[in-house]
Amino acid sequence: DQDCLPGWSFYEGHCYKVFNVKKTWEDAEKFCQKQSNGKHLATIEWLGKANFVAELVTLMKLETHVWIGLRVEDKRQQCSSHWTDGSAVSYENVVHNTKCFGLDQKTGYRTWVALRCELAYHFICMSRVPR
């Protein structure tokens, strides 16, 4: 629909597809990129998109977490976010190897959960609508 490739779903100028295979976070991102130019693991920047993605994933009946395109790049660096008192957020308290994020199956895929990047889960790719 809306010029997405067959099997992909349209929402707000992008196409999305949940893949029924399990990969590590890094392999899932590489897989998405190979689908064609401009594809990556899905990003979720607002509630409407979060709800759309949750519904799309729920339809697959996967029963596992699902990778999204969020990862802490370097736990030694401070995040660009800040606490309300202005101090920088650091990830020193994050469990080692827990720097990749997925949609939490237990909440109907409506919240994010920090996961070990080397574990294999299903994943959702997104791309801009082809012109």
From Swiss-Prot:
Expressed by the venom gland. One of its GO terms (cellular component) is extracellular region. InterPro entries: C-type_lectin-like (IPR001304), C-type_lectin-like/link_sf (IPR016186), CTDL_fold (IPR016187), Snaclec (IPR050976). Residues 11-126 form the C-type lectin domain. Heterodimer; disulfide-linked. It comes from the Eukaryota. Disulfide bonds join C4-C15, C32-C125, C100-C117. Shows greater sequence similarity to the alpha than beta subunits compared to other heterodimer snaclecs. The keyword Secreted applies. Belongs to the snaclec family. Keywords: Disulfide bond, Hemostasis impairing toxin, Secreted, Toxin. Gene3D superfamilies: Mannose-Binding Protein A, subunit A (3.10.100.10). Pfam families: Lectin_C. This is Snaclec A13. One of its GO terms (molecular function) is toxin activity. Interferes with one step of hemostasis (modulation of platelet aggregation, or coagulation cascade, for example). The keyword Disulfide bond applies. It is found in: Secreted. It comes from Macrovipera lebetinus (Levantine viper).
